[in-house]
């Protein structure tokens, strides 16, 4: 409830800022950040491994106030109006959810994955959590643990998974872009961003000298396959792009969650979780796990919604 209230305050702040009420907008935005931070700190009272902190709440609130000041500066410089015009020219009117998902996708890629760009591999972890939760109870007999034999992915399967992992955000963007020109520009931007973030993740894990060590023939084949499908999808209607995105995500999640982890993947996780970037590895981990499922829900909603211009 508190988080929903914070979201409402944030929308109110933006509306007041656009209306010229800069001081009132800054106050509402700061209150929104304070309410959201307070809700998170309050929830930590119920988590055994977390300790709420008044200092964290104060710093988060101060960060919200700084953001409100910067928003006022951007508004006076005309940057917010320029973004509104750009969005109106390039994206569909109801593309808010898709834009949020596209903005979160690079951060989800930072956490090491079994397959590059293969987000959402949670089957093994979910099963382990279920086993621990129902251990010693009659429900333990319901888990078909021995039937879930997993095998490593072949190079061809890896290439296909990489292509599917790239096509999911690509089709999501296609479903929100208004023109063919926008789609043509979006393809190299997405591919370039994917390469950059994957290299950054490898550099954070193994060191800058190994930033491009993850590129091997299946990765190149996956990019080529994704590029070929993207050329075909350029002319597809927006609703069909959402349908194809749902199919892509369903296949990707099925294949990834039926494959076994390799020793190299376990080594990557150990290097990441014990490294200097442990303070934000949890956030990127949850984004990597949940992003495909959030995209599935967004795509389902877009498919069943009435047609929009």
Locate predicted features.
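Long, hydrophobic, well-ordered secondary-structure blocks that form the structural core
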Residues: 58-61
């Amino acid at each position: 409830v508190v988080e929903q209230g914070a979201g409402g305050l944030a929308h109110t702040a933006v509306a007041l800022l656009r209306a010229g009420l800069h001081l009132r907008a800054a106050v509402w935005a700061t209150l929104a950040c304070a309410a959201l931070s307070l809700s998170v700190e309050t929830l930590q009272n119920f988590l055994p491994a977390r300790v709420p902190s008044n200092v964290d709440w104060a710093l988060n609130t101060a960060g919200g106030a700084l953001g409100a000041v910067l928003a006022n500066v951007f508004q006076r410089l005309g940057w917010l109006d320029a973004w509104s015009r750009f969005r109106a020219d390039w994206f569909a009117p109801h593309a808010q959810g898709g834009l949020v998902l596209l903005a979160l996708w690079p951060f989800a890629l930072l956490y090491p994955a079994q397959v590059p760009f293969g987000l959402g591999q949670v089957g093994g972890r979910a099963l382990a959590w279920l086993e621990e939760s129902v251990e010693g109870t009659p429900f333990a007999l319901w888990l078909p643990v021995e039937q879930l034999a997993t095998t490593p992915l072949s190079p061809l399967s890896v290439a296909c998974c990489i292509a599917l992992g790239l096509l999911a955000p690509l089709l999501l963007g296609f479903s929100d872009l208004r023109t063919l020109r926008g789609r043509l520009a979006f393809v190299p931007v997405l591919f370039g961003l994917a390469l950059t973030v994957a290299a950054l993740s490898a550099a954070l894990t193994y060191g800058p000298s190994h930033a491009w060590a993850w590129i091997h023939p299946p990765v190149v084949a996956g990019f080529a396959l994704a590029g070929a499908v993207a050329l075909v999808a350029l002319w597809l209607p927006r609703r069909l792009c959402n349908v194809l995105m749902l199919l892509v995500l369903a296949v990707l999640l099925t294949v990834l969650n039926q494959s076994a982890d390799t020793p190299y993947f376990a080594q990557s996780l150990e290097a990441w979780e014990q490294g200097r970037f442990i303070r934000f590895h949890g956030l990127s981990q949850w984004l990597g796990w949940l992003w495909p499922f959030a995209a599935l829900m967004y795509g389902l909603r877009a498919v069943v919604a009435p047609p929009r211009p």
